[in-house]
Amino acid sequence: MFKKSNFIGTHQEKIDKYYYMIKELGHGSYGHVYRCQRISTGEVFACKKFVKKLIKNKKGLKTEIDLLRATDHPNIIKLYETFEDKHHLYLIMEECSGGELFQRLALNAKNNKLYTEKDAARMMKQILEAVNYLHYHGVCHRDLKPENILLSSMDECSQLKLIDFGLSKVLKTMDDIMNGAVGTLYYMAPEVILGSYNEKCDVWSCGVILYIMLSGNPPFYAKNEDKLKQKICEMKYNFDAPAFSKVSQDAKDLIRQIFVDSESRPTISDILNSTWVKENAPNASSETLNIDWGRIMKYSKLNLVQKSVINFRAFHMTTSEAQEFIDIFKLIDENSDGVLTIDEIKNGIKHCKFNFKINEDNLIKLFNDMDIDKNGLINYTEFVSALMDYEKSIKQEHLIACFQNYDEDHSGKISFKEFCRILRPQNEIERKELKELYDRFDDNGDGEIDINEFIQGFKKTVN
């Protein structure tokens, strides 16, 4: 059973054999962040370097890595692989060249420039969609703030990426109560300060971010921590800032609905369905979106190795490369939970242009062929994989990078064991089928697949 997370490698060795550190982007108490380049392919990433002895919250770091392995959403940062040596831990991640949302907000405030409601709504919607995905999957972030939101590029319409899951909590049910005040005080809900809360603490934090976007100021401010806690717990805020004279009643009403006690507070899903979000940040027009069902049918006929290569490429697509697919995915994802059901796909056909007539039986078959992790849902990477024009999108360097991901011991050959590590057969029948597939790629019959056999095998079978 293949999953996107199968491609996120864990390496107990020095990183400098594989990555070159281009320049430092920032640093903190834990270590440094670098812009880095993969030596074999030239691809550029961000590298988070931790000094192991300085890691104070090892449990939190493990939680973050585990969650990044599991999550698959266009507005959540991607983790590609990890390296660990005697003194350091390295996380290779998606590069976001636009910096922190906090920096953008601070620059706007300095230049006396605020976001329009449409711009604020566009960005808030992305944050809300990422948080909604987490909540649907039983995760509470617990530290939502502009410093933990990155912009994928310097472009004004850049996609946002949620980061830093070190304080996140995986819940057994969404009725679970959490204890212990964690997070950043300015964005902290009253119930978190009081020490007993649920996932709606994230809703409050989103309200604080929205308030700052629209006004340039935090809703709760005091000269010392105790007074700030008091103001938050008493929910003392106002719309007196000059900027609010130009803010719509719908926006103010939404903020009022958020800054209430937890039981009365709306869910993230409720906010996504609010008048203000829907009117100011509608989905991309279905008139401009096109689902190429012929391409999906072609993809459905590929074998598991081919699909894994295409999924690897889809997983490594930059946000700008994937923008059209993101728009289609979000249009079809009716409840914004970050995955697609068969019913959402059916309804999506009505909204998007498509160039292929398809009956329900064929649609169900295509759905099952797209669902390569067999969980009954189509996740984001699976969706992009099926829609992308892989013959144009997959270059030699992508095939090399995918081969190296299969080649866990870096021997220059893929063994059958390494083959199974990625493709994960669930029983003896699947293992036998994989062995037959492996032998088809092993052109010279020496019991291993080298780089040329891998590339030629992929190209031959795709063509």
Where are these regions (language model features)?
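Conserved short submotifs of the Hanks-type protein kinase catalytic core
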Residues: H87-E100, R104
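Conserved N-lobe ATP-binding subsite of Hanks-type protein kinase domains
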Residues: H32
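Conserved N-lobe beta3->alphaC-helix segment of eukaryotic protein kinase catalytic domains
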Residues: K49-T71
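Activation segment signature within eukaryotic-like protein kinase domains
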Residues: M123-M124
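Amphipathic regulatory helices of Ca2+-sensor modules
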Residues: I310, T341-N355, N379-Y390, S415-N427, ...
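Activation-segment/catalytic-loop signature of the eukaryotic protein kinase fold
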Residues: T82
